Amino acid sequence: MNDSIKACLAAACLALPLLAQGAETLTIATVNNNDMIRMQRLSKVFEESHPDIALKWVVLEENVLRQRLTTDIATQGGQFDLLTIGMYEAALWGAKGWLEPMSGLPADYALDDLLPSVRDGLSVKGTLYALPFYAEASITYYRKDLFQQAGLRMPEQPTWTQLGEFAARLNRPDQGQYGICLRGKAGWGENMALIGTLANAFGARWFDERWQPEFSGGEWKKALDFYVSTLKRYGPPGASSNGFNENLALFNSGKCAIWVDASVAGSFVTDKSQSKVADATGFAFAPREVTDKGASWLYSWALAIPASSRAKDAAKAFATWATSQAYGKLVADREGVANVPPGTRASTYSEAYLAAAPFARVTLESLKRVDPNHPTLKPVPYVGIQLVTIPEFQAIGTQVGKLFSAALTGQMSSDQALAAAQQSTAREMKRAGYPK
């Protein structure tokens, strides 16, 4: 081999690591939900078309993700370039200037295609701070086969009382079949998302118009008594450890007759590759009780860029790709139209999608009905259905969630949990200077 060839080969070998080092690393923090895991898997398509961007994934359990992101963004730590957040964080962090505005999006992104309730929930004073990956309401899942065998009929929108009665009829713990599955895992976005909407349906509210907590009221007592007694009697063992993913696994394995949770689960419970009850699952609106105001939540997992990111352009490129119509088509082509991330775009709800996704009509109608500005039967000073959009809510909701989880395990009574929630919330609100 002559010297000139050797020199060329040596130069080429040296260039390879330099090319690899030249790629900009984009660190993405996300939640370990199925749709996000699919996004991570399909992100190879993005990397192929963006060889100058190398993706680094940090995938965390929901409560852990929220804690990590809150700490990082409040301290401007800069650990992450792209965050998976919800409407609560988008509103508060956007207002504080902690997030980059999602402006200057390409025309083919079709911003006007986003559902108004979702776009508004991720905006502050008309400025969009996060791009919605999927959006959800809460709906009722139930086993059509079990209802038919028992001679029961699920209403289009049941009451919680009716669900309790159905759960009693369908509870067969000796056969590994439980009447109802509900979130019990403590967390402001876990058990309190479910309990918050249940309480709304019973006519309760977090605060009165003077920002005084209302856990001492009769509506909260009825709501929590129902939740605890129903889940203790007719729920699965260890319900206090179950969040969205745990209950999804239980329902898919045929262990839950009824499940009230996020509409995004629709594509998973009807997927025969992961659900034993895909053909036997029915869908209804989230239960009401004395009202349907605030009976169904509104939530979106969305992608946002922290102001501390050192890779803002790369982050916007990926966020735009992952929330685009083109990404939806990619999912439809590779994994089936029913698996397209739901709830964010009007164009998703084509006739083909509606035909392939039996949960789609209930989901879309629920998303049209929700109103975070008027979330409860009685007037309130806050915005938010299953949450209260104030900075203090994350700590308050987490603490109340722990107390209600303790009531579920029998460590304290419902009355004791409510009294403790009233005291701790009043103390936190006073410390924060409410009413403001």
Curated annotation (Swiss-Prot):
Know the name of this protein? Mannitol-binding protein
An annotated GO cellular component of this protein is: periplasmic space
Gene3D superfamilies recorded = Periplasmic binding protein-like II
Q: What is its main location?
A: periplasm
- What is the organism of origin for this protein? Pseudomonas aeruginosa (strain ATCC 15692 / DSM 22644 / CIP 104116 / JCM 14847 / LMG 12228 / 1C / PRS 101 / PAO1)
Hey, what's the signal peptide range on this chain? Answer: 1-22
Q: Which family does it belong to?
A: Belongs to the bacterial solute-binding protein 1 family.
Question: What is the recorded function of this protein according to its Swiss-Prot or TrEMBL entry?
Answer: Binds mannitol with high affinity.
Its annotated compartments are: Periplasm
Which keywords does the record carry? Answer: Periplasm, Signal, Transport
Pfam hit, one: SBP_bac_1
